[in-house]
Amino acid sequence: MKGIKKLLGLGLALTLSLGMAACSSSGKDNEEVGDKLQQIKDSGKLVLATSADYSPYEFHAMVDGKDTIVGFDVSIANAIADEIGVELEVMDMDFDGLLGALNADKADIVLACMTPDEERVKNADFSELYYEDKNVVIVRKGEEDKIKSDEDLKNINVGVQRGSTQEGFVVDTLGSTNYKSLTKIPDLMLELQNGNIDAIVTGKNVAAINVQNYDNVAIGNSNVGENCEESGAVALKKSDSNDSLVELINKVIKKLQDEGKVDEYMQEAIKLADEQ
């Protein structure tokens, strides 16, 4: 009997020990996951990743004699940082590397006029939309009526930004194989000027700025690409720790929309882009 009692005692001790270890491990996991909003507050900064070649959303400008990343998306990000009570730090990189930066914990959020399409929502969390825009085509002057339908895009060499919604539209929706995908809009504009591509599919606001900055180009007279809307939402690393941060971001977005600040930020960005 004493032997049985001893074995039972050892079994109970082992069970308690394993239970405590499991609780300890679970607590550690929860601590590692933590709350993203609190982590940002503790760090004192909100790190934004963007691709600053997409004026008026994000671009380089001389501000007080210093090269600075500015634009519509940056204004939205600043409003979010202000609400949290931290400084905004901006990282500039290629558009197709933005979600990778989130997953590698190099950035807290991405604002880059990024549409939360079906593929992206598998790999990132998103806020509510803060802006929506139509797509247009940029062509060489004198060719404004050359492209009349989406089908016409399949018969020409089209330029799109790599990793963009427009690339998905051209490749997946139209099934086009005759296209050029580059990481930066200015590079696409030069390709168009030099005759290496026939058109660029991009957002209406981006097109309006770029046709002013480059010679011999214009916006096409058609509704090509209008079924592929461009919209902006804040992207975050896919995680269970984002709930409070997403809630705060959505609160900021609604407040900016209700107060007319979203349109104000866009007009300010367009004006600043025109001055560069």
Where are these regions (language model features)?
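C-terminal motif of bacterial Sec signal peptides marking the signal peptidase cleavage site
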Residues: L18-A22
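Extended ligand-binding regions for polar small-molecule ligands
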Residues: S24, V74-E83, S164, S231-A273
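Extracytoplasmic small-molecule ligand-binding "clamshell" domains
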Residues: D29-C113
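Flexible hinge/capping segments at coil-to-helix
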Residues: Q39, R140-N157
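Short loop->beta-strand "edge-of-pocket" segments that line small-molecule binding or catalytic clefts
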Residues: G44-T50, D150-G163
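Short helices/loops that flank or line small-molecule/ion binding pockets
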Residues: A79-E83, M91-D92, D96-I109, N123-D125, ...
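A ligand-binding cleft/hinge motif common to bilobed small-molecule-binding domains
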Residues: G97, M114-K122, F169-D172, Q193-N194, ...
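Periplasmic-binding protein-like
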Residues: E132-V139, A208, Q212-K251, I270-Q276
